[in-house]
């Protein structure tokens, strides 16, 4: 995180995947303090536990959308408060096994739900989260200029 901060210019934007232990663990409060002091937390996307299992990592993680701002601006934001985009994704479209077996949407009869081209639709919430972000970004001034 510190190295990313060093690489970014002022008002630079970044996204980083972090284990949830960094965001919630009592022993890592200093990391959260570092982030909050130096970055505007524009958004947090909580990922399901099984997200990285097919790649060998058994860890719950989140994506942080951050913007580097100067210390004066950060002090003002932290004093006045600001909104952030938050979303909790529960369905990733595949099973939490080493193969990442795809999971498709099914109806109440147990039949696959198909799109307009006759293809099975993945059972995932990433698309909805992306739409939510796009709407949020269009309505709110999320990135400081």
Question: Which residues does each predicted region cover?
Answer:
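A conserved structural/catalytic subdomain of Rossmann-like adenosyl-cofactor enzymes
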Residues: 1-145
